[in-house]
Amino acid sequence: MALITKAIKGTKDVLPQDAYKIQYIEATARETAADFGYKEIRTPVFEHTELFQRGVGDTTDVVQKEMYTFNDKGGRSITLRPEGTSGAARAFLENGLCNEALPQKVYYLDSCYRYEKPQAGRLREFHQFGVECFGTQSPLADAELIALASAIFDRLGVTGLRLEINSIGCPTCRAKYYDALRSYFAARKDELCDTCQGRLERNPMRILDCKSPVCQEIAKDAPAVTDYLCDECREHFDKVQSYLKAQNIDYTVNSRIVRGLDYYTKTVFEFVVRLHWCPGHRVRRRALRRPD
């Protein structure tokens, strides 16, 4: 048998000359999170597949196309984590953190796995730093997460950042938005790519994320989610913006930031620098409920 001397496609070795740089970034992220009152949580690299199906969403590209899923020797369907929120939420419930003083503020720094086309800044194995504030619906918590991310970039000396924020509402007001999107895109369905034609019924908001130039052009005039927010979600978003202004954090509202996973709700944001970004979001309660 020939000696294997090449890493699997979509993975990358971290050599000594780069390891110290990554260690510095990780240490800065950990220290900043601790300064904001967050404590580290570590979860298994694989979970029951159902956890991601329920939390991330059956209709998402992640679940349908990108997960590394297999049956173990006991016949259980197991998935390498494609993101960190679901495992953190499961640990929050299983270990009774939900019964302790709330909110519970945790952070994680994990390897994640998605079967995607490898490209610059996007590999099949990647490292995700995330923070979760469980047990609060306060807009102040959303603003704090944004401030934390901003502080990490400041300490790393990253310049040229642009913060973009949006609100995608709650499941109630988002249902009306989905209807508006379906109506808009249905008129030009034949022009959409094959993938987006499939998204039209099951998850029309994902069309706004499509990288196809034709779909992007069609989406330019699509309804904005902020026009469909209920009163509660509108007030929540207004307060997030007020808190950011009070902390002198510059931002722009971008109604095209939608994020595609089912547990996203209300505030979503991205720090954009060149071709890379740092996304964030609020998780809705259903994603945190116990399995039946």
Where are these regions (language model features)?
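TRNA-recognition modules of translation machinery and tRNA-sensing kinases, especially anticodon-binding
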Residues: M1-D292
